[in-house]
Curated annotation (Swiss-Prot):
Assembly with partners or alone: The TCR-CD3 complex is composed of a CD3D/CD3E and a CD3G/CD3E heterodimers that preferentially associate with TCRalpha and TCRbeta, respectively, to form TCRalpha/CD3E/CD3G and TCRbeta/CD3G/CD3E trimers. In turn, the hexamer interacts with CD3Z homodimer to form the TCR-CD3 complex. Alternatively, TCRalpha and TCRbeta can be replaced by TCRgamma and TCRdelta.
Modifications after synthesis and translation: Phosphorylated on Tyr residues after T-cell receptor triggering by LCK in association with CD4/CD8. Phosphorylated also by PKC; leading to the TCR complex down-regulation. Phosphorylated on Tyr residues after T-cell receptor triggering by LCK in association with CD4/CD8.
Domain ITAM: 149-177
Annotated protein name in UniProt: T-cell surface glycoprotein CD3 gamma chain
Record comment regarding domains: A di-leucine motif and a tyrosine-based motif are individually sufficient to induce both endocytosis and delivery to lysosomes.
Glycosylation sites: N66
Gene (UniProt): CD3G
PANTHER family assigned to the protein according to its UniProt record, in alphabetical order: T-CELL SURFACE GLYCOPROTEIN CD3 GAMMA CHAIN (PTHR10570:SF8), T-CELL SURFACE GLYCOPROTEIN CD3 GAMMA CHAIN / DELTA CHAIN (PTHR10570)
Extracellular side: 23-116
Span of domain Ig-like: 23-98
GO molecular function list: transmembrane signaling receptor activity
Alphabetical list of SUPFAM superfamilies matching this protein: Immunoglobulin (SSF48726)
GO BP: adaptive immune response; cell surface receptor signaling pathway; positive thymic T cell selection
Length: 182
């Protein structure tokens, strides 16, 4: 049992040391990002002491500037300069820096998963709406009459009294002298 614990500890130590070795190969110097400029541009500064510096974005060389400059202007932050940047000198590389600008605070990134989610939700909601309309509209509008719904009708003699003969009053004429006859 003791050997199993030592073996597990050895495997864990080797795994952690491999990650440390990978970081050492990447570079000691960092790339600094300056996005608090008045003109809204994004500026990268390389921390390498070398004079001949080349800049890379996602594996492709960018910023073909003078060989003595250690800065790279990415342009305006509104143009979304996202990617993985690093600088390379004649002898060593810097650490990689991932730049990601999200200009819109309440935006949704439309990738295929988001669009398919919207479509799936729309189909499900339309299905529930159709089922609800089917069950509500499918009910019969005619209901069975009950004994309590029946009313006893009275004859006209008991409920109404006959009208009096009209007299020749102001409202008994439609026009001028024409009197109304019954």
């Amino acid at each position: 049992m003791e050997q199993g614990k030592h073996l597990a500890g050895l495997i864990l130590a080797i795994t952690l040391l491999q990650g440390t070795m990978a970081q050492l190969k990447e570079g000691k110097h960092s790339v600094l990002l300056d996005d608090n400029r008045e003109d809204g541009s994004v500026l990268l500064t390389c921390g390498l002491p070398d004079q001949n510096i080349r800049w890379f974005k996602d594996g492709k060389e960018i910023c073909s500037l003078n060989n003595s400059r250690s800065t790279c202007n990415l342009g305006s932050s509104s143009k979304d300069p996202r990617g993985i940047y690093w600088c390379e000198g004649s002898k060593e590389n810097s650490k990689r820096l991932q730049v990601y600008y999200r200009m819109c605070q309440n935006c949704i990134e439309l990738n295929s998963a988001t669009v398919s989610g919207f479509i799936f939700t729309e189909i499900i909601s339309l299905f529930f709406l159709a089922v609800g309309v089917y069950f509500i509209a499918g009910q019969d509008g005619v209901r069975q009459s009950r004994a309590s719904d029946k009313q006893t009708l009275l004859s006209n003699d008991q409920l109404y009294q006959p009208l009096k003969d009209r007299e020749d009053d102001q409202y008994s004429h439609l026009q001028g002298n024409n009197s109304r006859k019954n």
